[in-house]
Regions:
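PLP-dependent class I/II
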Residues: 2-4, 8, 12-14, 19, ...
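Generic structural signal for well-ordered alpha-helical scaffold segments
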Residues: 24, 78, 82, 108-109
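A glycine-/small-polar-enriched, mobile loop at the entrance of the PLP active site in fold-type I
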Residues: 37-40, 55-73
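Glycine-rich phosphate-binding segment of PLP-dependent enzymes
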Residues: 45-64, 78, 83
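Conserved N-terminal alpha-helix of the aminotransferase class I/II PLP-enzyme fold
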Residues: 64-97
Length: 397
């Protein structure tokens, strides 16, 4: 019997997509499900960006673009990095892809050889370890619990480094926790990395603009780190453009050239119309970005305050993104009389089936004691969801 490759067989399916699918199935049955499992803004793409896309269609931007993306888009990204982040790049140091997910995967693929180790702080985005495994590398997971705000320390980083370490994947603001590394915390990690000059940092900054503490901090801005850091970013979260699929890397030219070589053999350049929309996003008014950020901050305050009232939940105060990641292991071993809650995935399924609230268990994020809730939804949905969760958990003894 013909079988799929061992490489594919080793991959785990996406837990976030699986929960979203299960939620959709219940909704199709007419059940009122509040979906807190979705990792995308609930806002619409700003009108001026949509108008730019319409114009691109009328102007016949319908052919292949350069593999790395149109020069106009890459120049707009160069200007964004200089004006917003104080970082100097050239267009040759930018490569655009079909979303930031592909940008991360591209970078992993061009850096990692079989047996190489990639350090991944946990909790992590579910796809990071799978990308490393796809490249036949070894994910080295460094756990950071809620007591340290889900952020690793310099000592933990130092202890994880071996002669096989090729890269560190660092996500700030974080999916799934919403934690944000301060400038001082990044400097501490950088001091460790400077002792190991061959390690590349893959800095996933896709949630840069959904930030509640002020200026975004990039590890690339620290002296000595820019030439060994690959910034990953894109338009999906900040501009409510998840379906447009435009991400990018900014980094050393030798890595960018390798990424272009790889991408040229399996997807080529990203969608031409989406690129023109992304160009408009970066060069146009940033007021919609700030309006969405303010709405997310208000929702963050609401869900944190409500979740603190749920017995057995331990809650931090996320400083970015749009996720809450409460510790819920208090409920492990409890039962409603028909089922036993053994782990976070059991709890997430219980909440979906009983409370009709979709969350994602933390096991796939490297944190089996937590569940992820997205507050990229209305204030009314947030309030009702936490009420349902509280009522459902009260039935567990």
């Amino acid at each position: 019997m013909t079988q799929v490759s061992d490489r594919l067989a080793s991959l785990s399916p996406s837990a976030t997509l699986a929960m979203s699918q299960k939620s959709g199935e219940l909704k199709a049955q007419g059940i009122d499900v509040i979906n807190l499992s979705v990792g995308e803004p609930d806002f619409n793409t700003p009108d001026f960006i949509k108008e730019a896309a319409k114009k691109a269609i009328d102007d016949n931007f319908s052919r292949y673009s350069p593999v790395a993306g149109y020069p106009a888009l890459r120049n707009a990204i160069v200007a964004k990095l200089k004006n917003e982040n104080g970082l100097e790049y050239t267009a040759g140091q930018i490569s655009c892809a079909n979303g930031a997910k592909q940008s991360v995967c591209n970078t992993v693929m061009v850096l990692v050889n079989p047996g190489d180790e990639v350090i991944i702080p946990a909790p992590f985005w579910v796809s990071y370890p799978e990308m490393v495994k796809l490249a036949e590398g070894t994910p080295v997971i460094v756990p950071a619990g809620i007591e340290q705000d889900f952020k690793i320390t310099p000592a933990q980083l130092e202890a994880a480094i071996t002669p096989k370490t090729k890269a560190l994947i660092l996500c700030s603001p974080s999916n799934p926790t919403g934690s944000v590394y301060s400038a001082e915390e990044l400097a501490g990690l950088a001091e460790v990395l400077k002792k190991h000059p061959d390690i590349i940092v893959i800095a996933d900054e896709i949630y840069e603009h959904i930030n509640y503490i002020g200026k975004h901090n990039s590890i690339a801005s620290i002296e000595g780190m820019k030439d060994r850091t690959v910034i990953v970013n894109g338009v999906s979260k900040a501009y409510a453009m998840t379906g447009w699929r435009i991400g990018f890397i900014a980094g050393p030219e030798w890595i960018v050239k390798a990424v272009n070589k790889l991408q040229g053999q399996y997807t080529s350049g990203p969608c031409s119309v989406s690129q023109k929309a992304a160009e408009a996003a970066y060069t146009g008014s940033q007021e919609p970005v700030e309006e969405m950020r303010k709405a997310f901050e208000r929702r963050r305050d609401l869900i944190v305050n409500l979740a603190k009232e749920v017995p057995g939940f331990e809650v931090n105060n996320p400083e970015g993104a749009f996720y809450l990641f409460p510790k819920c292991s208090y409920y492990y071993g409890k039962t409603d009389g028909t089922r036993v809650i053994n782990n976070a995935d059991d709890l997430a399924m219980y909440l979906l089936e009983v409370a009709h609230v979709a969350c994602v268990g933390g096991t796939s994020f490297g944190a089996p004691e937590c569940i992820r809730m997205s507050y990229a939804t209305s204030d009314e949905n947030i309030a009702e969801a936490i009420k349902r969760i509280k009522d459902a958990l009260a039935a567990l003894k």
